Structure formats: structure tokens, C-alpha cells
Amino acid sequence: EAGRDQVPLLERIKFLSIYSSNLDEFYRVRMPVLMALDTLTTDKENEKAYRTAKVEINRQQHEFGRVLSEDILPELLKQKIHWIYKEEMPSKLKEETGKVFFNEILAVLHPVRIDIEEKVFFAQNNKLYQVVILEDQQGKERIELVNVPSDVLPRFYHFQADGLRYVVFLDDIIKQHLEHLFPKDKITGVFNVKITRDAELRLEEELDAMLKKIFGE
């Protein structure tokens, strides 16, 4: 429905939101079961079900991104609404986003260092985070986990500039101003992640899986 031109624009956006919410629920409820069956049994049908689900989800995610990027965002721009999505934040917004960062966001950010050797990992379930790769003045690298407080703050912020209304993700505002959270360090990488935890998964396994995805190992 979100990809149909005949559907009103606002309704198409709502359909994308519903899909995203349903996918979260599927990952919390169904995927752990499929993963467990794939791991614990030798039944080829169970293995096929898990892999089929992964392929279908990847296909749907690709289509989600295509519809949003190629259909929804251009239509919004025609109405002078610029939704910042997978692009650099315009520098002209930095002053306004900075006010929001210091007045609303900074106080509820709680960076936590990830101790890879000790497998210390305190991420909460079903929460958004930014994994920040830092390098100190001696060139030593470390990883910090920064919460994206969408449970207490709006997920989107609106700004006016040059006759356009900009729609900006909360996480993009945080990313733009991370230098104030880590003033003595060089930021070499920022990755958005969402933790959807299977109760049976050990935390050290979860940490290993996340780091492998980030570093491509």
C-alpha cells in the first residue's frame, strides 16, 4: 500500500510505520523460535523456514528503503518538507539542532564503555543505541555505547530553514553533536543499532554478534 501512488501520502507513511512496528514484533516473538529450531534440530524444514524468513525480511527491507527514498521523500519535498534520511545533516541546521541537543538531549544521554575483553554489555532490550568508535590522544581505540532516548524524547524534530521544513531523526541530532559528548577524542565511526534481545541469548554472544556486523568480520 505504501508504494501505491493512488494512496494519500500521509496514509503511505502510516503504512511504512505499521510495517516497521510489525517487523519489530516479529523479531521479538518469531525469529528467536526459528533461530532456536535451526540451531537445536537437524530438521531441514526448520532450517529452511529460518533462512526463508531472513531472505524475505531482507527483500522487504530493501523495498521499504526504495519506497521511502524514491517515492515518499520526493513527494514530501514537493510540499517543501525535507526529511533527512541517509544523508548528511545540512550545516545550516547545526545551530538549531545544537540548541535542541544542549537544552533537551544531552542531559538524558548515558554513554557506556563497551569492554570487549570482559564482555561487559549493558544494553537494554528493544532500545536504540549508537555505537561510537573513538580514538584518544594517544591513538588508543575504544568503543562507547550511547543511548538514543526515544522513550523520553520525540523520535523526530522539525526545523525551518530557507523556506523548507526539515524533519530530522533524534539519532541524527545526537550524531551531529557527539563531539561535545567526547571532546577529547577523535570520532572514527558511528553506527545505529537496535537491541532486540532473545531471552535465551547470552550477553557475550550478543556483543560478539553486534561487533562482527559493525566491523564486517
Predicted regions and their residues:
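N-terminal non-catalytic structural scaffold regions of very large proteins
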Residues: 1-217
